[in-house]
Regions:
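Acidic, low-complexity proline/glycine-rich segments
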Residues: 1-9
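Polyanionic, low-complexity intrinsically disordered segments
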Residues: 133-313
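Charge-enriched, short contiguous segments at helix-coil
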Residues: 5-6, 27, 89-146
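A long, hydrophobic alpha-helical segment
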Residues: 11-30
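Short, hydrophobic, well-ordered secondary-structure elements
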Residues: 29-50, 129
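A broadly used, surface-exposed interaction patch
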Residues: 49-113
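Amphipathic, well-ordered alpha-helical segments in soluble domains
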Residues: 9, 13-16, 35, 42, ...
Length: 313
C-alpha cells in the first residue's frame, strides 16, 4: 500500500532535481543525478514491497519458489535486482532497464569515486530525469492511503494544486506527466554527447598507440605497439614471473619473460583495436534510441577499460 505522503515526497525531490538541471552546472548536475537516482530506487522498492505484502504473506496465493527468490532478491539492497524485477513485471522495457542500470552506475562513480563525466553529465542527468518521470507516469499505484498528518511541500503543490487530503491517483499521474513534459523541453543531446565523449576516448588511445610506435603508423607496427604496451605493464608487477606460469611461460626454456610475452604469448588484444572501436562509434552515432545508445556507450567503456588504461600507462 502506497502512502500519498510518499508520492508527494517523490514529487518534491524531482522538482528539486529540476532546479539543479536548469542551472546547467556540473556540480548541480551531479546533485541532480543523486536525487533522481534516489527517486528511482525508492519508487521501485515501494512497489516491490506492495507486491511482497500480497505474494509472500498471504498463504492463499500460490507463488513458485523461483518467483519467491526473485522477489526476495528485489527486496534487498541491490538496485539492479529491483530494476530487473520491474522488467519481469512489465513495468519497464529491457531497454529502459539497461539504461537505468547504466545511469545508476554513473551516479555511483560520480558520488563514490569522484569521477566527473563532465562532457556528458548534463545530458545524462536530463535523460535520467526523463526516464524516471516516464516510469512514474505509468506507475501502478494500486491501493494508497492518506493521513491528516500528511505534509505537502510547496514544491509538490506546484504540480498538485490546492492543498487537499483527498488527492487522487489522477492528480499524481498528471503531476509526473508534467515533469515528463518538462524533461522534453530541457532537450535531448544524449546521443550526440555520448558519441563526442566516446570519440575523444578513442582518439586518446589512438594517440597513445602512435606514441608507442614512434609515429610509424603501419598496421604491423601498431599491432606490435599494442602487444608491447601490455607486455611492458605486465612485467612491471613484482610477481610477473609467477603469474606468467599460469599463462604457459616456462623459464627453463631459456627465454626472457619480456621476450616470451612479446613474441609468443597470445594477448586478448593482439591487434590495433582502433578501427573496430571507430566502427562501434559509428554504430552509436546511428542510433535513434537514446537508451540503446547509452547501452552501447557503457558496454564500450567497460569492455575497453583495461586496454585503454594499459595504453595510457
Amino acid at each position: 500500500m502506497i502512502e500519498t505522503q510518499f508520492l508527494t515526497d517523490l514529487l518534491d525531490q524531482l522538482d528539486l532535481a529540476l532546479d539543479q538541471l536548469i542551472l546547467n552546472d556540473r556540480n548541480h548536475d551531479r546533485f541532480a543525478i543523486i536525487l533522481i537516482d534516489n527517486v528511482a530506487e525508492l519508487a521501485f522498492h515501494a512497489r516491490i514491497v506492495s507486491i511482497a505484502d500480497i505474494e509472500l504473506d498471504r498463504k492463499t496465493i500460490v507463488i513458485s519458489s523461483d518467483s519467491q527468490k526473485q522477489l526476495r532478491r528485489a527486496l534487498g539492497r541491490g538496485f539492479d535486482q529491483k530494476v530487473r524485477f520491474g522488467v519481469t513485471k512489465g513495468w519497464i522495457s529491457q531497454e529502459q532497464c539497461d539504461a537505468m542500470i547504466g545511469l545508476h552506475g554513473f551516479r555511483n562513480s560520480s558520488y563514490h569515486q569522484g569521477l566527473r563525466h563532465e562532457e556528458i553529465l548534463h545530458s545524462l542527468a536530463i535523460a535520467y530525469f526523463r526516464l524516471v518521470s516516464e516510469f512514474l507516469v505509468s506507475y501502478n499505484f494500486g491501493s494508497y492511503v492518506t493521513s491528516s498528518s500528511d505534509r505537502v511541500s510547496y514544491r509538490a503543490l506546484k504540480y498538485l494544486g490546492t492543498p487537499s487530503y483527498s488527492y487522487s491517483i489522477e492528480h499524481f499521474t498528471a503531476a509526473f506527466r508534467r515533469l515528463e513534459e518538462i524533461s522534453v523541453i530541457l532537450g535531448d543531446t544524449l546521443i550526440r554527447d555520448l558519441a563526442s565523449d566516446m570519440s575523444s576516448t578513442i582518439e586518446s588511445s589512438d594517440s597513445s598507440i602512435s606514441f608507442i610506435s614512434c609515429s610509424d603508423d603501419t598496421p604491423e607496427r601498431r599491432d606490435w605497439s599494442v602487444v608491447f604496451a601490455q607486455t611492458f605493464v605486465f612485467t612491471q608487477d613484482e610477481d610477473a614471473e609467477e603469474k606468467a606460469v599460469d599463462l604457459g611461460y616456462n623459464k627453463a626454456e631459456g627465454k626472457r619473460l619480456f621476450d616470451w610475452l612479446l613474441e609468443d604469448y597470445r594477448w586478448q588484444v593482439s591487434r590495433d583495436p582502433i578501427p573496430g572501436w571507430r566502427n562501434r562509434l559509428n554504430s552509436l552515432r546511428a542510433e535513434v534510441s537514446p537508451w540503446r545508445a547509452l547501452k552501447k556507450y557503457c558496454d564500450f567503456m567497460e569492455q575497453t577499460n583495461d586496454i585503454r588504461l594499459t595504453l595510457y600507462e
